[in-house]
Each structure stands twice: as C-alpha cells, then as structure tokens.
C-alpha cells in the first residue's frame, strides 16, 4: 500500500472485514446492551485508557435518547471506516428534534432527568455529527479516536455492513483505502448467506488490502483468482481522485452519484460472478465535482432509495447517509452494505 496524505509511519492500518454491530433500541434494557457493546468494541479497536468507558457513556446516552424520545431507533457500532477508532451511529424514525442547539447544551432536558445527553457526548467524542428533521427522525454519528489519530475521525467516509436478520455470519463486506492514487472503496456481496458467503467476502477484502493502489481491473482480477475455490461474489470498486470517479464492478453492486439536489448518474456492475465467470472488467469514469457524494451498495439495500429522494437524504454527510440508507431501505432477509464517500469542497 502506498501511503496517502498523512501516511508513512503510524499510517492507518487496514480495517478488518467485520460487520457492523446493530443494537435495536426497542426497550430500556437495550441501553445497557448498547453501552456494553461499545465498551467491548472500543477495546477491540485498541482505544487506550478511559476511552472504552467513554465510548460506553456515548452509546448509553444515545440509546437513552432513543428510548425516551423516539421510535424505530437503533445504534450501529463499528471500527472507523479508515484508521483507528470507534464509530457509534444512532438512527431513528422520528419525531426529530425541534431545538437541536438547545439539546446540545449541558443540562438541557425535555424530561425530568439529568439532561447530560448530547452535551456530554459532544465533550467526549472526537467528532460529533447530527442531522434532524421534524417528522423524519434524527441521525447522530459520534467518532472516538486515539489522541494521536484524531484525523481518522474526520474523514468524509461512511460504511455500514449488516448480516441478514437471524444470521450470525455476514456475506457482505466493505473496505476503504487512501493511497497516492486517491480514495479507493470496495463493496463485496458473497453469493448466498452464511459462513461460506462470509469467507468469500473476507477473502476479497484481504486481496484488496494487499494492493489497494492497483488499477481497478487488476483489483478485480486478483479477487477473481483468490475466489476460485469459493462461492464467488459480486464486487464493486470505486476510486475517487480530484474531480473524477472511476468505477469497476461485476455483479449486482451499484453506485450512484449525488449532488445536494439530485441523484446524478447510476451504474451497476457487469453481469457475472467474481471467482466463477467474470468478464474482462471495464472501468467507467464519471465526473465528480467538489461536493459530490458517491454511494456504493450491495443489493441488500433497495435501489428505490435513489428514485426521487428527499433533499434531507441527499445532503447528509457520508457517515449519516450510510446509516440512513441501511436503516430506511435495508432488505432484512439479505446482507446489506453501503459505502459513502464525498469529494472535498474547494475553498472559496
């Protein structure tokens, strides 16, 4: 891997092909589960000192807010998409917060409680991103990174990867790499479900991390060789650099480009199965002006999300957009993966 900006010694190590942990907040007992899950994952991510306990506080406060004030809510917890640290995302289906700035004030509460809530989370988290809309709901992303790696929490990248309901194994996977050639993202959908699909997806991720700066067709060719004795997979890879996006995919992995007002272009992979009957991979290049968001997702996310979406969805930052798509458009009987990346705005 060629280190990207800020690379070299201490550069971010490749993320593991681990699915997102989802904790539905359907009862107050789920608050304790969310806190325990955050503490465990923070330790697995290598967060030092008191950070695992602080992660538990963040998860507890977010889960408590959903239990008290919202409906249809869940917490999504995982390693940062790129780099070291933990990401905790809360998503619900309403009613939304009417006075967001007041809710961020320490001690503010709409119930007869201590009101530590969002003010405490803002102090603890390395970064905190919130969007809310009356009648639609609220999305919150809190990222915690070690003191020497705070930039890892600031990258405009989002991923979510969930197994089908009732499955212990996830046949989907995602990975992101930042090299001198740009930001490269991978989404994998191993054929079928269960342990064999999961192994195919993990093999594709391992292959990706060996040479993430290779040409996109070469990445798919390497995955094709690595998956020869597996179930095979649908794979999509994109590379974002300057004002262009290159996409190369085989199978039912889709990409869409979003502006603040509309869904621009949509692409799907070439027919075939990586590891079995892959055609010669073709690169398709799209313009990606500053401020463009690229969405890469497997078929576990219903593609109808991209048909006339509301501006609230289009304008979400990448971590919240990934969560909104999974929370709102996931097919519960299939594994689901979303990767979202955004081109930086040019200084005015």
Please identify what each model-predicted range represents:
Residues 65, 123, 127, 207-210, ...:
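Amphipathic alpha-helical regulatory segments at dimerization interfaces
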